[in-house]
Amino acid sequence: MRHILFLFTALALVCTYSATNIKAEVPLTAFGVWDRGSSFDPKDYPFLKGLSFNAPWADVERQPGLFDWSDLDQAVEKAFRNKSFLYLSLGVGPEAPEWIYEKGVPKVFTDDTRHQGKWEYYPYYLAPAYKFHFTRLITEFGRHVRSYPRDKQDRIAFIQLKTGCTGDEAAYKGAAKDPRYELPKTSPAWRTFRLEAFALFVKTFQQGPGRPIDLLFNSVGGDADGDERYTEEWGWLTTHLKQGFGIKNGALSRGHHLKGERALYEQWTKFLIDPKGLTLFRRSEMDQTWRKPWYQLNVPLSFYWGAVNALNGGQSVWDITKSALEASKEEGFDSSFYFFNKYAGQIHPETATDAFCALHKGLDAADTKAYPEDKFGKASPQNVSRMLKITEEYARYGAKVDDKDALLMGQVEQRRSQEGFNDVGWQIWPDNYSRFLYQIDADKTSVPLWRVGGPITKSSPIYARFARGFEHASGKDAMYFKLHDRFFKDDKAKVVTIHLVWYDGREGSTWKLLYDAGDPVMKTAFSVTGAGTKKWHDKTVTLTDAVMRHGGTRGSDIALVNTDDRDDIFSILEVHRDLP
């Protein structure tokens, strides 16, 4: 036992490496929608890229030193048989077996009431006996994984670390009633325990014989509330890991206009989309959020914009809970899963086959440049008056606040309790959602629109939530778009398919789509005359002479041009190419 305890502590001193050499090795073909469990067959749900194995410690080691890996074997076999991917995790902490308390691990009772009936108490993680048995568990876990043939190990995309209570990485739910056992999430003692556990996983799964397996971490950097308390953990990872790793970061795919989402974009996206040096992957889950009041206002719409929001932030894996998977076909939101799959693995512009730009504007009350304090009031997350003034500025375009109380909520409480759509918020994403296709001077050439066609109801089309349009009265009669500079490399003619979703709002209204064909003047792909159906339509065109090297007006590759004095509305523009 002394040897294992020494090992647990000493592992934190593994050699250091340069962060620029760390590149996640999860195959891009694994990026997409996953089964949060392992009960679904990809034949029935063809959008599934992978499944998960998550077992409580108590089920794996019912008696001290006797390990039952039969459920793990079945999960690996299923992934191998279906040619799908798998990620692994073990629930520790309150999911430990009862016998550890007979081996000298103190029970810790907390003041938590929300999880009563699920967890009555927790182990004291710093107890020598707990460290001993935890280390043995992870060591045996790794030994068993390494016993699989290489072709089966290759189906394991990554392993999620859980050092505390669930994957949220806290020692307890609530505070310990006995102050001797208190372990706040940011306390030095808990941080030391976590870093020792990190080192144990690195040694077990990324060093020694066998294929190194990527690891997934949570609470290792800033979060949606701008909390930077985990920078020491981040520093440890980027100086000690040689192999790839990912982050668990759940806000973006669970909604849109969530407090603090802009901070998550700014912190992580550079490591996820077109990364330079350090390359990560990002997992998020859809838990029971989809059954909460806000999501239920319009389930297909909520899933769609959650997918778009997540893709804009570089999410790689979207782990969907059982109830949502079962309902997806019946309620018509599985199309969002296919959309997510289409773009999740498109992280390098040189090799991407597709690009999109979903037109949107979020009114970020934290932005004092866009919304000066002398006009709208002091910038503060508690200043609801400022948020309402900003919204009023755009009310003529459909901007609105349905739930004032939610403006003061954190993003977790938003997902749980929000009861309406808000077009303003604190640190929300302000611009279009996109992947390698960008609108040029969006606010100077178009107007943002919200709730197109009227209030959002359960039957509103998914595109009704956000859009952009012409405004002839203010001279905004053309919208310009450009692809990433490295999406195309030469000036040769190429075969390109364009897909556009637009709103047919006015009979007789005319507009056209132009593209860069390498000529001095942009070429017309198609023209449209509206019928005034008040419905969303889509149009797809395949071009054989597209150059798209920013040779159009304002350096654009594609343009939407108004050809009369009536205003037109658009939702999403997509570009597809076939690679040689």
Residue ranges of model-derived segments:
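Glycan-recognition and processing domains
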Residues: 376-487, 576
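Short, surface-exposed beta-strand/strand-loop-strand elements in extracellular ectodomains
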Residues: 508-521
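Substrate-binding cleft/loops of secretory-pathway carbohydrate-active enzymes
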Residues: 160, 165-171, 182, 186, ...
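N-terminal substrate-binding region of glycoside hydrolase catalytic domains
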Residues: 22-125, 281, 286-290, 294, ...
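An active-site-proximal structural segment forming one wall of the substrate-binding cleft
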Residues: 80, 114, 118-160, 193, ...
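Short beta-strand-plus-loop segments that form exposed binding edges in beta-rich domains
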Residues: 558-566
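Substrate-binding cleft of secreted/luminal carbohydrate-active enzymes
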Residues: 91, 243-423
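Extracellular carbohydrate recognition and processing domains
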Residues: 520-552
